[in-house]
Design a protein with these regions (language model features):
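N-terminal secretory signal peptides that target proteins for export/translocation
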Residues: 1-53
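Periplasm-facing N-terminal accessory domains of Gram-negative outer-membrane beta-barrel systems
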Residues: 26, 43-45, 51-183, 268, ...
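Acidic, glycine-rich flexible loop segments
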Residues: 164, 172-228, 235-282, 286-293, ...
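Transmembrane beta-barrel strands of outer-membrane/channel proteins
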Residues: 170, 307-313, 354-358, 458-462, ...
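Hydrophobic, lipid-facing positions within transmembrane beta-strands of outer-membrane proteins
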Residues: 227, 269, 288-290, 335-339, ...
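Residues on the lipid-exposed face of transmembrane beta-strands in outer-membrane beta-barrel proteins
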Residues: 231, 294, 339-343, 444-448, ...
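Feature marks flexible
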Residues: 368-439, 474-479, 526-561, 586-660, ...
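Surface-exposed extracellular loop regions of Gram-negative outer-membrane beta-barrel proteins
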Residues: 518-520, 679, 685, 728-753
Length: 753
């Protein structure tokens, strides 16, 4: 049976409060016993002053999300110069790079300056062979290539007429063709590193300038996603995550991909993780933080497999500082396990890789809530004159408050205190309820080599998870037990990429991807039949009593969204004697569907009513007025206007041009230009209205979010790179800082809240 509390009455009827909600503006009057919906709420946007207005608004947005980043090529390049023992360059040297594991080969001839460039190599270990008539053949083995890097391999060939191979092992080389500051973590380290939760983001913090965010509970507003990293002090949502060159960030909230566990699983399915922290080339953009690139494993000519499990529990744990001494250590058991298999489907041509990871966890979380003590449950509170006279030994020194009979079922939601007494009718309630998390991740990748100059791969990854959360402590949540929530998340990531050498000096990469992320947080109704909502059949809402912990289910639950991002991108690179030119374009279509509910289950607020003319006799007026069922406000949803579902749409187009120019043997110039275009966010069914200027508008304007979107979003790049010798050791580098526009769609959702 629904229970409804009366608003406080005073002799002169007046409006107490007007609350703008996510869908309704609700007024509360002192002589009414119900909420009245005045008119539908609207999204607000800054008034139009110039074409840069939306940019300024986005910078100030609470839930700022930085839009799409065009990824640098996931393939590596080998460059170098061939000389003779006197230092003279040698033209016409046959350079061949090959991989034993996949059979991939690339070949080129040095130009008149002795330079060569071989591109299109997936991350891995390669060998380079240099040969020319009348010179000894030289072979360099063990060259480890990382994604998006250009590794210099400079050789000096000795004169010799006898056929002879000189084989040496490669030293660690530095990419001198870019000013980007980055670090790579290779496959062996990904497996061996003792990472908590086997989380991808734990690898990022190994790099300078990267710090983890506090390990708190996943935020409601991030749909349960957590595990973020801050790069160079920027917001975690400004960190872009790429999987095989495809953007994997949530298009609405900007958070990086993760399941309900808060971890980004799947490290055993990755061959490399690369973290870029600053001074990016033009093929990166639109993100104010850094970039984390993950490259999935591929198969080889040999069959390989793995089977593993990690177990962790609380057997050797010490008690938390807040745990009660009389209680056992809160339960904690975590199991992570997985298996993988890889091999050839057709020797030297088709390879596959499959990976599975599972995550199971049961953990009790210690929580401290402020609730009424045993005397307050009986209507006995300390007096404002002599509060120390009220205690369990002398209850006669307490002030008796007439408890409204309708509050009995609400007081039953509040267990008695078992911790410190606050001396105002409240005390601490320390509990440790159990939560559980289940997550499963699967990855399948197939690579097909048409020839040494043409290859294709397809990859699909799914992450399905759910988590029972005993406390939604993140505001507006509660640490009072008995109001758990259920988080669910299912993420799909699909990508196809075609790579081909059009000519020896021209390489093209075409990619297509679809990301679909569905996340929700719902109420576990543990008190059926108890409701304060204006809508029938809703679970219990929330009581907000000043000076106490919130009681009930969070007013922002249920919360969820389903987002789909379509990505099409193409990048062309061409090499001449002195220039390496890259051109690229990317088109992204963003679809985000879901409700933005607030207060759908009802929210009563109790506080000191003495400013409104009421009298209080105790030292805790808010609790006193609660016991008398006198709220200051109620937030609810108009039963006749309760549809908050919205289907948002946006298109983002990005393009760039980058030229690496070798000016001299010791100086190179890296110059680039990037352009980003963001369409005006829209709602598929026209259910979007905006108050463009609150000072002059008489009502909302139905239509798109902004009157005008930014049109000039150009971002130049310039870097100087020098070498102390032909061995290509960098001695200087400079690049002007640039900052890019943020996604307009996330601003729409932010304002909507």
């Amino acid at each position: 049976m629904a229970t409804k509390l009366l608003t406080p009455r005073r002799p002169n009827s007046q409006q107490l409060r007007v609350l703008p909600l996510g869908r309704d503006t609700v007024s509360f009057w002192s002589d009414m016993d119900k909420a009245v919906a005045v008119r539908p709420s609207t999204f607000h946007a800054a008034p139009k002053h110039d074409s840069h207005g939306p940019c300024i608004l986005l910078t100030l947005s609470l839930l700022l999300y930085v839009g799409s980043a065009w990824p640098q090529s996931q393939l590596a390049t080998i460059v170098g110069t061939i000389t003779d023992p006197t230092g003279a360059v040698i033209a016409g040297v046959q350079i061949t790079a090959s991989s034993k594991s996949t059979g991939l080969k690339r070949a080129a001839l040095t130009d008149i300056g002795g330079h060569y460039r071989l591109g299109g190599f997936p991350p891995g270990v390669y060998a380079v062979r240099a040969e020319k008539q009348n010179f000894q053949t030289q072979v360099i083995e063990g060259i480890a290539l990382s994604s998006g890097t250009a590794i210099p391999i400079n050789l000096s060939l000795s004169v010799g007429t006898v056929q002879q191979d000189v084989t040496v092992n490669a030293d660690v080389a530095i990419d001198t063709t870019t000013s980007t500051v980055s670090g790579a973590i290779v496959e062996r380290s990904l497996i061996d590193l003792p990472l908590n939760g086997r989380d991808l983001f734990k690898t990022a913090i190994l790099q300078p300038g990267v710090t983890p965010t506090p390990s708190s509970a996943p935020s409601l507003l991030s749909n349960g996603k957590a595990g973020q990293a801050s790069i160079n002090g920027m917001r975690p949502s400004w960190t872009n995550v790429l999987i095989d060159g495809m953007d994997a960030n949530d298009p609405v909230f900007g958070f990086s991909p993760a399941g309900a566990s808060g971890f980004f699983l799947g490290l055993n399915g990755l061959t490399e993780v690369r973290i870029l922290t600053q001074t990016f080339d033009a093929d990166y953009g639109s993100y104010g933080g850094g970039v984390i690139e993950a490259v999935t494993k591929s198969g080889s000519n040999q069959f390989h497999g793995s089977l593993w499990e990690l177990h962790r529990d609380g057997s050797l744990d010490a008690k938390n500082y807040f745990d009660l001494a009389s209680r056992p250590i809160p339960a904690f058991v975590r199991n992570q396990f997985g298996a993988s298999i890889a091999g050839p489907l057709a020797h030297h041509r088709t390879f596959f890789f499959a990976n599975y990871e599972g995550f199971r966890e049961v953990q009790a979380s210690t929580a401290i809530a402020t609730v009424p003590d045993a005397l307050a449950h009986q209507g006995l509170l300390p007096s404002a004159v002599d509060p120390g006279a009220c205690n369990n030994t002398t209850p006669s020194g307490c002030v008796a408050v007439a408890v409204d009979p309708r509050l009995a079922q609400f007081l039953a939601l509040l267990p008695p205190t078992n911790g410190a007494d606050n001396g105002d009718g409240t005390g601490d309630l320390v509990t440790a309820n159990k939560g559980s998390t289940t997550e499963n991740l699967g990855l399948v990748r197939v690579d097909y080599n048409f020839s040494n100059s043409h290859s294709l791969f397809a990859r699909y990854m799914i992450d399905d998870s759910s988590s029972l959360v005993p406390y939604i402590g993140t505001p507006p949540g509660t640490y009072v037990p008995g109001f758990p929530a259920l988080r669910r998340a299912r993420n799909h990531y699909f990508a196809v990429q075609d790579r081909r050498n059009l000519r020896q000096e021209v390489f093209n990469e075409f990619g297509f991807g679809i990301n679909r992320t569905t996340a929700s947080t719902s109420i576990v109704d543990t008190h059926p039949g108890l409701s304060i909502s204006l809508l029938p059949g809703r679970p219990f809402g929330m009581l907000n009593i000043a000076g106490m912990s919130l009681v009930g289910n969070s007013p922002v639950i249920p919360l969820g969204s389903s987002s789909t991002v379509y990505q099409v991108q193409d990048q062309l690179s061409s090499t001449t004697h002195r220039h390496t030119i890259k051109l690229g374009v990317q088109v992204r279509r963003i679809q985000s569907n879901g409700p933005l509910d607030f207060g759908v289950n009802g929210l009563y607020t109790f506080q000191d009513l003495r400013p409104f003319g009421f009298q209080a006799r105790t030292n805790n007026p808010a609790l006193e007025f609660f016991l008398q069922a006198l709220p200051v406000s109620y937030v609810g949803v108009d039963p006749f206007n309760s549809d908050s579902n919205r289907d948002y749409r946006q298109i983002v187009v990005s393009g760039f041009a980058q030229d690496f120019f070798r000016a001299t043997s010791r100086l190179s110039v890296n110059v680039g230009l990037r352009y980003d275009f963001y369409s005006n966010p829209s709602e598929a069914h026209g259910r979007l209205s905006v108050i463009r200027n609150p000072a002059t508008d008489s009502g909302p304007t139905v239509g798109k979010l902004f009157a005008e979107t930014p049109q000039i979003c150009c971002h130049p790049r310039l870097a100087l790179l020098g070498t102390s010798s032909v061995t290509a050791r960098p001695y200087c580098g400079a690049e002007p800082a640039s900052f890019a526009i943020n996604s307009l769609l996330s601003c729409l959702v932010s304002i909507g809240f």
